[in-house]
Amino acid sequence: SQLSEFARTGSEPAFRQLVARHFDLVHATALRRVNGDRSLAQELAQTVFTDLARQARTLPTDTILAGWLYRHTCFQA
């Protein structure tokens, strides 16, 4: 998976693919949590993906990334 590739190698292209694949989920979740504030939702999405980049190596190999991103977005909001 792209997550395991990124966690193993730190590959920027793999991370960009992760962001491209999951950005809409994270942004839409953030937008709902901040009552439609687009600027704040964008900031939250950046924070969530920054956290993912920092924590990818420590996530269990069976992590369901969409679930992790959703929960982390809710937690950050």
Where do the model's predicted regions map?
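Extreme N-terminal regulatory/targeting segments of RNA polymerase sigma factors
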Residues: 1-5
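Short, charged helix-capping/linker segments at alpha-helix termini
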Residues: 8-17, 27-47, 57-63
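Hydrophobic-face residues of short alpha-helical interaction/recognition segments
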Residues: 26, 30, 56, 69, ...
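Structural recognition of an alpha-helix C-terminal capping motif at a helix-to-coil junction
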Residues: 43-50, 63-75
